Amino acid sequence: IDEIDKSDDEFEAFLLEILSDYQVSIPEIGTIKGQIKPIVFLTSNNTREIGDALKRRCLHLYIPFPDPFLEEKIISSRVPEIDKNLKIQLVNFVQGLRNLDLKKLPSVSETIDWARSLVLLNVKTLEPTLVRETLNILLKFQTDIDVSDPEIDNLIEQSKK
């Protein structure tokens, strides 16, 4: 179940029954009991606190952002046509963005989207004007774009190293 933190309390209560008793009660139909114990994966972006009862029934696994080497491999596999130097620069730039005080750090999927966009634009290297014109692909809040703007030149320079 993707992004459980975006669900409401009623859905959490529904999940508790599934995870505790391996059954679902539907007023119009009755109780349906599972033949086998389900294996359920929940993902969360931490946009709200999940109830303690649900947390007790789950194992927690935190997956951090990938290091630059792994992120380059991910970009290569998802955007194989990207220029090698652009890929390195793009990954270093995004890694630098993630060090800023942003409301929402750019995810790997947003990095992939940005890489695809830059390939479609036939970009070979990051330039300040281009980055400013496409930053909304990476950053989803105007406040984050505003925070990033004064750092763009420095981030581009650092990404070339």
Language-model region placement:
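C-terminal regulatory/interaction module of P-loop NTP-utilizing enzymes
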Residues: 1-161
